[in-house]
Each structure stands twice: as C-alpha cells, then as structure tokens.
Amino acid sequence: GEGHLTALDVDAIEMAKTEERLRNQGFGPDILTVRKINFANIDEVAEKDGKFDFILADLGVSSMQIDNPDRGFSYKYDGPLDLRLDQTKGEPASERLKHVTRDEFEGMLIENSDEPYAAEIASVVMQELKKGHPVDTTSKLRELIEKALVRVPAADRKEAVKKSCARTFQALRIDVNSEFEVLETFLQKLPDVLNPGGRVAVLTFHSGEDRLVKKSFKENVKAGIYSEAAKDVIRPSAEECRCNS
C-alpha cells in the first residue's frame, strides 16, 4: 500500500514554502503530514502518528535559509546577526555574544567548527563588545574576523578570512540552536520510535555531527538495539556537489 510521509521542521518560514511546493506536486493530507516541531521531540510525533519504518534526518541549514539576508546565516550578505532556525524561540546570535566570555567564545569556535584562529577572533570580538559597540550584523562580524586575521600573510588572507567566516558563523549557529544537544536527544530517542526492521539515514554536514551519529549507531549495534550500521559513509558525487553549489 501507499506510505505516509511525516515532515518535521522548526523553521516556520521555510516549512510553509516547502509544504506549498509539495502540496502543488500532489502530496495531499492523505500521504503528507507537516508538523512544526523539533526532531528532538520525535517521540511526541510517534505517539500521535505511530512509529516509523524509515527516518531521514537532514542536519544543518538549507541554501534557502543561507540565501535569505534577514536570517543572518551567511557572512556573504549583510543582515541582522540572528542565526536562529526558529525565530520565535531563544535569543539571536547578537544577544548570545553579549553573554559569553572571551574564553567561552574561543571554546565555542574550537568545539563547534575547529576554528584555527579561535583565540584571535574571540579576542577581537570581545574587545569590540567591551567598548560598548554592538556586533549585531553579519557584515560587522565579518569585519571583525578580517581584523583578527590581520597577521595572516597577504597572499593567503582573503581565503583564510572566507574560511574563518564560514566556520565562525557555523559555530555560532550550532550554539544558538543547541544543535549538538538536539541531535544527541534525537539519536537517543530513535530506537523507541522505529518499527521492527525500521531504518535510519542521517545527512551530516560537518565532523561534529558525524562523530555524534557514528558514536550513537556504533553503541546501539554493540548493545544489540540495531542489527547493523553502515561501515562507510555515502558521499555526494562531484555532479551532486556541482548541482548544489
């Protein structure tokens, strides 16, 4: 018989667009349910809709979110330094920065994105905040990252700044949205929401997510909860990367 797709997201803005697109393609209420809920609460969804035969978790952010300047996900566009996936909850990144110490911010950059210039970036950003100057736009944060990397040789600086900007925005986004904690909660609840013989696939974007997923799957195979876990990751082809760039 026909399956039923339950789609979860915390981003009401993108969720509405995606639902409209799917409905226009013929996905009616009989085969598609859309819920605004964090996948950390997948147990609540399973209680309402029943357990799942297959779960696909697509982590991180989409190009639609990144390309919207009002969301503040990208250093490439000027906009408010927000970075929240759900703009109805929590505090934006600009507020979060006011409530962390230099050491905490440095730790965040190292743990969430392996930023090699974490100490320099944290120092410059915190100096700016101590002066009473707000760091509330994406362009302002980018400007401070450029300042922090002033000692990088001129020939390498442009590329280094670009990479450090991407890593810094990633680290802040992970922190603002508690992404690692949310992922760990989701992974812990998975065995209880899957039907016997159910399968799970997780699309990870960076090593921090990848480590958590591998650890959880490995532990559950060892405990006899999962029958097996893929030994190798499936990487996107060059063609897929080109289409998504």
Can you name each region flagged by the protein language model?
Residues G1-S245:
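S-adenosyl-L-methionine-dependent methyltransferase catalytic core, i.e., the SAM/SAH-binding region
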